[in-house]
């Protein structure tokens, strides 16, 4: 089972007390994507940090601006620990339906992470019969989500939105090992940003199909953006398979940001009464 999140979920109970706004968790709709950042007030990257005890740290995000109060008072916040005792195994959610395509992109240092944004149509995913358009991806180290308390070395978030502003994010976890081929294509651009004061760089055409997922299994739950304004009602899909990345690639993502911080991972948030589902295809669906 090397490279897979450890899952033995048969007979796991469903979390009770679903809220109405958890409409997507128990439905028979298609999977979702992790979209995590540009809703409501666009965060000023210098206005918050990840330092424990800092006046701008995660415990204080909800007090910095009124528009960020959900970071403190929300009850569907992300990330969470994907504890197997809470997870209900389902087979009706269906495979992730991705229809990505190459498009012009830019790489931007947001002060707390590196964000790759597609300027044109980079394709979409289908979630619950709705098309979510791929907007950007960014990285957190170490991972923000945990599995049975285990934190991984890196987490990629692929942010998708509908024209009406609904958000879905797909998260992919990484452990130290062989190089990630998608990050390898961005190495020269990351190094260029780390060696200069530039905050943004045109990286030409980038094909999101080169982001490897490698598993049909995934977790799904309703949560929030993991950075201010911590907007809720985000559909999260966390891919079951753990990919690999080199330590040098993880370090480069941090060095290029110039924030002198060893982490940009938000602490784990209370799950409250939310449901967490784990999609596992039926035997007849595997072909």
Can you annotate each of these PLM segments?
Residues 1-287:
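Alpha-carbonic anhydrase
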């Amino acid at each position: 089972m090397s490279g897979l999140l450890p899952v033995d979920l048969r007979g796991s109970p469903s979390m009770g007390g679903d809220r109405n706004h958890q409409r997507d968790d128990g439905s028979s709709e298609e999977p979702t994507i992790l979209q995590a950042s540009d809703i409501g007030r666009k965060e000023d990257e210098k206005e918050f940090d990840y330092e424990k005890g800092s006046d701008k740290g995660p415990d204080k995000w909800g007090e910095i601006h009124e528009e960020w109060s959900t970071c403190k008072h929300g009850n569907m916040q992300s990330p969470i620990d994907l504890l197997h005792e809470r997870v209900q195994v389902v087979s009706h959610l269906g495979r992730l339906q991705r229809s990505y395509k190459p498009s012009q992109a830019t790489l931007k240092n947001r002060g707390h992470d590196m964000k790759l944004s597609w300027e044109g149509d980079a394709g979409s995913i289908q979630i619950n019969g709705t098309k979510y358009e791929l907007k950007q991806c960014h990285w957190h180290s170490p991972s923000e989500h945990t599995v049975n308390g285990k934190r991984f070395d890196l987490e990629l978030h692929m942010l998708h939105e509908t024209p009406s502003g609904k958000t879905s994010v797909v998260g992919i976890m990484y452990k130290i090992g062989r190089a990630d081929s998608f990050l390898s294509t961005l190495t020269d651009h990351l190094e260029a940003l780390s060696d200069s004061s530039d905050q943004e760089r045109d990286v030409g055409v980038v094909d999101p199909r080169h982001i490897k997922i490698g598993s049909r299994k995934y977790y799904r739950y309703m949560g929030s953006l993991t950075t201010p304004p911590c907007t809720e009602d985000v559909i999260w899909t966390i891919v079951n398979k753990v990919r690999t990345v080199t330590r040098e690639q993880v370090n480069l993502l941090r060095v290029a940001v110039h924030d002198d911080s060893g982490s940009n991972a938000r602490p784990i948030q209370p799950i409250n009464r939310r449901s967490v589902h784990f999609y596992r295809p039926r035997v007849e669906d595997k072909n």
